[in-house]
Amino acid sequence: MARSKIALIGAGQIGGTLALLAGLKELGDVVLFDLVEGVPQGKALDLAELSPVAGFDAAFAGTGAYEQIAGADVVIVTAGVPRKPGMSRDDLLAVNLKVMEQAGAGIAKYAPDAFVICVTNPLDAMVWALQKASGLPRHKVVGMAGVLDSARLRYFLADEFNVSVEDVTAMVLGGHGDTMVPLMRYCTVAGIPVPDLIRIGWTSTDRIEAIVTRTRNGGAEIVELLKSGSAFYAPAASAIVMAESYLKDKKRVLPVAAPLSGEYGFRDLYVGVPAVIGARGVERIVELELDRAERAQFEQSVASVQGLVDACAKIAPDLVR
């Protein structure tokens, strides 16, 4: 049986890590695309030479031509300008919007049947623009955000309780930014909700609120530490989880930036919600019942996303025609 083909648009830190993880998980052959001559080719060769050591079979190719992504089963878009210290994800909007238009056109021409995962920031607006530019079905284009945000929250909670990360579950909704909505009612340790752990004295409300704040600032914390560039290991691993669920039809329930069609009371936006990812792409959205406070936070987050989408529409009006 022929191996799946995974195309990575952007061969930077995230793209290179994605290629490595795809190889290690034996998800398929990999094409690295980047406009910087030599970078995708060099990384592809390095990864190919790693495969005998790591013990996997996969073909790696580097290119600066979109035609080389032809027939890709999965396309993961990471291309764009990363954040620098002091910048928010929103500061990247105008320049990365142009990248999404170019990537969308390339995907539409050469990989129209692919499942597309957007990683580029500001995420919720960029995945919206990428779907508009590509014209692909909305359920075949998603954004990577909630998996990463929830993973950060899981790690912080595991550290707080001094337990294995494997026993911690977490759920983060809303936009991939300062207004994201961590839902503590749905965060558990071995099935025990965090609010119950507060009641039995394992932690305090103040400490949990500090963890929520740290989760919202998780990306910025890494940007400040690195000084140049942004997180790449965890974002790549998060996108690979989504790709694997699609390629293997695992039907995992993952928090992703998914297209809303009335769920949660919103339409025509990509917002972070739990969704089933399988061979048909976004197969179902899980619509949680939110209490009054959660609903207010979620609506604030959606309003932030809407503002970014409106800004995209003003910069590139052809996307909404």
UniProtKB/Swiss-Prot annotation:
Keyword terms, alphabetized: NAD, Oxidoreductase, Tricarboxylic acid cycle
Residues binding NAD(+), per UniProt: 10-15, 34, 96, 119-121
Enzyme class: oxidoreductase
GO molecular function annotations of the record: L-lactate dehydrogenase activity; L-malate dehydrogenase (NAD+) activity
InterPro entries per the UniProt record, alphabetical: L-lactate/malate_DH, Lactate/malate_DH_C, Lactate/malate_DH_N, Lactate_DH/Glyco_Ohase_4_C, Malate_DH_type3, NAD(P)-bd_dom_sf
GO biological process entries: lactate metabolic process; tricarboxylic acid cycle
EC number(s) recorded for this UniProt protein: 1.1.1.37
Catalytic activity: (S)-malate + NAD(+) = oxaloacetate + NADH + H(+)
Residues the entry annotates as binding substrate: 83, 89, 121, 152
Active site: 176
Keyword Oxidoreductase on entry: yes
Keyword Oxidoreductase included in the entry's annotation: yes
Similarity section: Belongs to the LDH/MDH superfamily. MDH type 3 family.
Purpose of the protein: Catalyzes the reversible oxidation of malate to oxaloacetate.
Protein name as catalogued: Malate dehydrogenase
Organism: Azorhizobium caulinodans (strain ATCC 43989 / DSM 5975 / JCM 20966 / LMG 6465 / NBRC 14845 / NCIMB 13405 / ORS 571)
Originating gene: mdh
